[in-house]
Amino acid sequence: MRFTSVRGVKINFKIVGSKGPWVSLNPGGRREYKEAEPLAEYVAAKGYRVMLHDRRNVGASDISLSAKETEEAVWADDLYELLSQNDALPAFVGGSSSGARMSMLFGLRHPEATRGLLLMRVTGGA
């Protein structure tokens, strides 16, 4: 496990691959980044660096319930900061279900940092 502080919250993350454009993969629901590891390994083998992380309130990352915005908006801004800290911008950002919704918000909130979106199983949510 590797941790960093992102906007006052300890975030667990992993980088897969050592060269190429950056990609962030985000599982759905409240699943840990481990769910996306097989896909990350495949993408990295094709010449990309992949950022995986446990979003706040998920997996090994800290719990923080004080946000005044939707959780997916908070996650999008956390991801922006995490990618910034690792000189990983601009990036392709993608995910499934809640990870897809968070990715779309990332693109809307940080268009200059978004190379493209990879959206899988785009579903509803509260």
Language-model regions: role of each:
Residues 39-43, 67-70, 111:
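Glycine-rich, phosphate-binding/catalytic loops in enzymes
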Residues 89-125:
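Conserved hydrolase catalytic core segment
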Residues 1-10:
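N-terminal cap/lid segment of alpha/beta-hydrolase-fold proteins
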Residues 52-94:
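Active-site loop/oxyanion-hole signature of alpha/beta-hydrolase fold enzymes
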Residues 37, 80, 104:
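Active-site phosphate/pyrophosphate- and oxyanion-stabilizing loops and adjacent acidic/basic residues
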Residues 9-62:
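Conserved HGGG/HGGXW glycine-rich cap/lid loop of the alpha/beta-hydrolase fold
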